[in-house]
């Protein structure tokens, strides 16, 4: 049985003409000379490297669909009918006290200075992609009122059109980063936090120093990769001027916008977007320890580490050196990938799947514990969207796994809520929404709960944030029922 059929996918806007397809190659069994399209090979014949990336950029998120032999769906949660655990010691255990809605869903992470979460989930890294930028207000306020952490991803300062440098070439002013942080803080209530992620370019630009000195952030995140790819992050650029600007700032821009032939091709319309790529930092134990010490000297009380779906060696390094460095949270992101823009073949065919990666992580965590080493708090990531899978990851990972990082699963409610607000203003509600009502109060099932809490401030809460909060309430209830 094939785990994935190549050569055509909705994410790339490609499909096979033939009803029958060779299973290994994904090529139509009857490939016609004169075919008008459009499989991957057909489209790649004249659009080339464009066909590597899901699209259109800035309008979609994409998730790999390779179906691995084993995942969290292959195990079930085991219940019991005698007694209950977790109730206060002086509680009479019985049908009146062991009720699901009393379950405490809070968790925390951190080596010394803990961060509390109302739910054992937090967002994936929302960085310089257009999806993250355009929806930030919805995502950030939604996370804040839900009491969870939001991760501001890589390259936000470096991509800021209004970025200003000091005389040493470091960040002096970044209005976009300021907006990101201030938006979350406006509704922060003591649960969760905003942490900023750093890659090679961010380090060179002095992003850590900027967010520490101007915003007094407690936490910074180092990045060793992700589950979607083993290269640095990328976005698309729609103008030649923007491509030249970012190349000047030190980014890899392809094709090279400084070449005359490339400029001519862009101006003639042969291609309409440039690719901006980030560098992937090389890792070592000494390097991690030195960088963590440097960041603590800068002023951060917490340093977290995000690592990807690399080999067992890199995972062991992250856990061992993370322990030595007293990392506050180690996020382990498995394959396959979810993305705003990552190469589609790599998202499907690279890296260790999340379930397998967690099995390795638990083996290494127990080995560290047997050696008398403290295991850093761990979060798993990679393909999570529902409370049942989160429950399984926490149960398998107990007591080391404290939370689950959810990428698209937490972005979707923000985008749905945002669009409901837009459709209401336009008077263009689709039937899938209007069957529940014609006003925000009718459509959002818990709207009045939020209004009772925030009163006049409701006008400051965008509908996308209401969507995330509403999803979080469903997650909480479902999670309580499982517990």
Predicted regions, residues:
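Conserved, well-structured core domains of diverse proteins
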Residues: 1-119, 131-144, 149, 161-162, ...
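Hydrophobic faces of well-ordered beta-strands that scaffold small-molecule active sites
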Residues: 119-124, 148-154, 192-198, 218-224, ...
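Active-site beta-loop-alpha junctions enriched in small/polar residues
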Residues: 126-128, 155-157, 197-203, 225-227, ...
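Active-site-adjacent beta->alpha loops and helix N-cap segments on the catalytic face
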Residues: 132-133, 160-181, 202-209, 230-238, ...
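Phosphate/diphosphate-binding loops
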Residues: 189-213, 356-359, 363, 433-437
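Active-site beta->alpha loop and helix N-cap motifs at the rims of alpha/beta catalytic domains
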Residues: 193-204, 224-228, 271-285
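Terminal interaction modules at protein C-ends
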Residues: 257-265
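Glycine-rich phosphate/ribose-binding loops and adjacent secondary-structure elements
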Residues: 266-455, 459-466
């Amino acid at each position: 049985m094939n785990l994935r059929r190549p050569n055509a996918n909705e994410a790339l806007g490609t499909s096979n003409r033939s009803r029958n397809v060779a299973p290994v190659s994904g090529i139509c069994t009857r490939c016609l000379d004169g075919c008008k399209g459009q499989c991957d090979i057909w489209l790649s014949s004249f659009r080339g490297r464009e066909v590597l990336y899901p699209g259109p950029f800035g309008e979609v998120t994409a998730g790999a669909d390779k179906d691995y032999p084993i995942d969290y769906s292959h195990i079930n949660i085991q219940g019991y009918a005698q007694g209950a655990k977790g109730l206060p010691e002086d509680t009479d255990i019985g049908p009146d006290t062991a009720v699901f809605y009393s379950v405490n869903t809070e968790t925390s992470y951190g080596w010394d200075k803990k961060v509390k979460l109302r739910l054992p989930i937090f967002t994936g890294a929302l960085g310089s992609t257009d999806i993250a930028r355009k929806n930030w207000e919805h995502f950030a306020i939604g996370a804040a009122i839900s009491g969870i952490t939001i991760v501001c991803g890589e390259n936000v300062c470096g991509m800021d059109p209004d970025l200003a440098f000091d005389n040493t070439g470091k960040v002096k002013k970044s209005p976009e980063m300021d907006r990101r942080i201030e938006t979350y803080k406006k509704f922060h209530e003591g649960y969760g936090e905003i942490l900023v992620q750093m890659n090679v370019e961010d380090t060179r630009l002095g992003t850590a120093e900027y967010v520490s000195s101007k915003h007094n952030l407690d936490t910074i995140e180092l990045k060793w990769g992700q589950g979607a790819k083993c290269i640095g992050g990328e976005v698309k650029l729609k103008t030649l001027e923007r491509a030249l600007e970012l190349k000047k700032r030190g980014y890899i821009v392809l094709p090279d916008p400084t070449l005359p032939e490339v400029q001519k091709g862009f101006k003639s319309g042969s291609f309409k977007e440039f690719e901006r790529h980030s560098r992937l930092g090389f890792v070592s134990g000494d390097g991690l320890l030195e960088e963590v010490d440097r960041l603590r000297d800068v002023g951060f009380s917490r340093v977290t580490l995000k690592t990807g779906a690399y080999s067992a060696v890199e995972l062991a390094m992250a856990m061992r050196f993370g322990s030595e460095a007293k990392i506050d949270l180690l996020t382990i992101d498995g394959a396959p990938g979810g993305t705003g823009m990552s190469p589609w073949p790599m998202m499907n065919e690279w890296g260790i799947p999340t379930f397998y990666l967690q099995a390795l992580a638990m083996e290494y965590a127990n080995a560290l514990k047997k050696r008398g080493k403290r295991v850093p708090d761990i979060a798993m990531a990679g393909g999570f969207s529902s409370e049942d899978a989160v429950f399984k990851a926490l149960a398998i990972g107990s007591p080391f796994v404290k939370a689950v990082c959810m990428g698209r699963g937490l972005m979707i409610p923000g985008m749905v809520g945002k669009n409901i607000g837009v459709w209401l203003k336009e008077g263009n509600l689709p039937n899938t929404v209007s069957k529940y009502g014609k006003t925000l109060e009718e459509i959002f099932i818990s709207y009045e709960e939020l209004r009772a809490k925030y009163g006049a401030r409701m006008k400051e809460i965008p509908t996308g944030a209401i969507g995330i909060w509403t999803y979080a309430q469903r997650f909480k209830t479902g999670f309580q029922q499982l517990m």
